[in-house]
Amino acid sequence: LLIDKTDNLEEHMWYTQQCLENGWSSTVLAHQIESGLYYRQALADKTTNFKTRLANPFSEQAEEIMKDPYIFDFIPNAKKLREIELEDALVQQITKLLLEFGSGFAFMGRQYPIQVGKREFFIDLLFYNVKLHCYFVVELKTVEFEPEFAGKLSFYLSAVDGELKSPSDNPTIGLLLCKGKDKMVAE
């Protein structure tokens, strides 16, 4: 499968390593190759602030689990859905969503309530990564990236770190999924 479906030795070796680390079946491997995981994860030009906000080696581990772009081809018309409809579709397809994120993710909840002061806020999707020992907040936007979205995500990360994270957990990671981005604005 690897020899037939991969373009070069480096890609072949990367998928081999992923199979060993994640225990992928041949079906999962075939899906990951077809979705271009190598190009989206290993070679992607990712827009994150992990290197400036997180200590090594945690920043490198957090960077490794990110992809650009995420592929939600298992959801019909994903690009045309409103946020709540996209959220509904992702929750219905949670197994495939976890497969897209990678190994080690556990689903904690949708519209996860978190109390900050006297107010209650709702995180679109909350996960826990058992390999990285950290919470993983997903904020969904069905429009182009706007700077205020990063502020809201940062607020959620601080709230989760303050309310849910245990002393043995690593800092919370956030993923802001937008319809698109102006790379300069997003950075």
Predicted segment positions?
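Basic, low-complexity intrinsically disordered segments
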Residues: 1-187
